[in-house]
């Protein structure tokens, strides 16, 4: 585990590390929770950052922008409205950024919520949570890769790699597991359970980002698991009306009582054992700005691993800010060509959804 003292020492040095350099970031799903905590840490550690924040309503987020601005008067904070579960909206937002910016140092994505066991679909036909946890993230990444690569090219060759542009997806990296899996399962109602959904979106993020890391070596790709954090995600899950949905009145009442008991018992315990939100923001900023190749080399010198060691360029990160080095679980998927298959599936979904929206056949 990377100590909090080391995290804070690194973050405190970001002002000097980025002196004379612009830092431009786009945050998706960061109007609260981990993403917002990371923004708060970033704007206090870098003098004049430019931060784009995607939100559902710029008017409703205006007060939060004002609060953030008070933390750093020199920060440029831009709220961008968008319904990110819709790929067409993702394209619109990306086009705004591409027109305004000549560089992008960090694409930070953390949208989503816990599955409630009942799929719901966007007007574009995608399962909503699958879109938030996977499809929209990959669409942002694909659209903004030219900007990320341009940033990499403008950096001087002798600059430290902690200034390499970075794609950062907060979900469940490092917790991939062996399971009967095909990419198409993401859209299957038959496989829509909480555990299956988490397992599938976790694996798809890892496979697709690893594929991109091989294709785009000038950009770092991170799939991170934040662990248990003191956000409202568990409370929202337990309080969701979907948790008590049933045709039978008695069963609906029993489920409602169970949720009340869980809220009374589980939530206090969760907040005791979970990581403070401020610390999570500190750790996520560290992971988004540290020299990951150097950390990879450092961890490689630690006691030997039993499995196959992951290669640098694509990093799965633990909530402790350590890189997941054991790559054994992914070997079977690679042998089956799953990274390429996941990528092909993703591109096919993009074409299908966006061609339908534009009226193409």
Curated annotation (Swiss-Prot):
Keywords: Membrane, Oxidoreductase, Transmembrane, Transmembrane helix. The chain crosses the membrane at residues 257-277. Oxidoreductase; part of the gene cluster 23 that mediates the biosynthesis of a family of 2-pyridones known as leporins. The hybrid PKS-NRPS synthetase lepA and the enoyl reductase lepG are responsible for fusion of phenylalanine with a hexaketide and subsequent release of the stable tetramic acid precursor, pre-leporin C. Because lepA lacks a designated enoylreductase (ER) domain, the required activity is provided the enoyl reductase lepG. It is possible that the dehydrogenase lepF also participates in production of pre-leporin C. InterPro entries: NAD(P)-bd_dom_sf (IPR036291), Sec_Metab_Biosynth_Oxidored (IPR052228). SUPFAM superfamilies: NAD(P)-binding Rossmann-fold domains. This is Oxidoreductase lepF. Belongs to the NmrA-type oxidoreductase family. It is an enzyme of class 1 (oxidoreductase). It is found in: Membrane. Disruption phenotype: Results in a significant reduction in leporin C and absence of detectable amounts of leporin B. The keyword Transmembrane applies. It is a single-pass membrane protein. Its EC number is 1.-.-.-. One of its GO terms (molecular function) is oxidoreductase activity. It comes from the Eukaryota. Its main location: membrane. GO terms for cellular component: membrane.
């Amino acid at each position: 585990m990377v100590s909090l003292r080391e995290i804070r020492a690194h973050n405190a040095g970001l002002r000097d590390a980025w002196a004379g350099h612009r830092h431009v970031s786009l945050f998706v799903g960061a109007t609260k929770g981990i993403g917002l905590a990371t923004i708060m840490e970033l704007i206090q550690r870098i003098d004049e950052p430019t931060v784009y924040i995607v939100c559902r309503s710029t008017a409703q987020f205006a007060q939060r922008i004002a609060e953030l601005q008070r933390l750093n008067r020199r920060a440029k904070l831009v709220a961008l409205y968008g319904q990110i579960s819709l790929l067409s909206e993702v394209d619109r937002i990306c086009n705004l950024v591409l027109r305004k910016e000549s560089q992008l140092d960090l694409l930070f994505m953390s949208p989503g919520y816990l599955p409630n066991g009942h799929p719901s679909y966007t007007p574009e036909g995608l399962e909503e949570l699958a879109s938030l946890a996977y499809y929209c993230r990959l669409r942002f990444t694909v659209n903004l890769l030219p900007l990320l690569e341009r940033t990499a090219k403008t950096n001087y060759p002798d600059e430290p790699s902690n200034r390499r542009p970075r794609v950062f997806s907060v979900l469940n990296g490092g917790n991939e597991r062996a399971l009967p899996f095909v990419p198409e399962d993401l859209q299957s109602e038959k496989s829509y359970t909480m555990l299956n959904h988490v397992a599938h979106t976790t694996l798809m993020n890892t496979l697709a980002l690893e594929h991109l890391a091989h294709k785009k070596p000038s950009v770092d790709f991170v799939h991170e698991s934040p662990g248990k954090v003191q956000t409202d995600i568990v409370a929202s899950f337990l309080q969701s009306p979907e948790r008590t949905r049933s045709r039978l009145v008695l069963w609906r009442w029993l489920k409602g009582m169970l949720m009340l008991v869980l809220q009374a018992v589980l939530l206090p315990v969760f907040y005791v054992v979970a990581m403070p939100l401020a610390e999570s923001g500190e750790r996520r900023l560290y992971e988004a700005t540290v020299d990951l190749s150097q950390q990879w080399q450092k961890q490689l010198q630690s006691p030997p691993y039993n499995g196959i060691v992951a290669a640098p360029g694509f990093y799965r990160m633990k909530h402790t800010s350590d890189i997941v080095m054991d790559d054994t679980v992914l070997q079977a998927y690679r042998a089956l060509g799953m990274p390429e298959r996941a990528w092909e599936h993703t591109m096919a979904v993009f074409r299908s959804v966006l061609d339908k929206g534009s009226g193409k056949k």
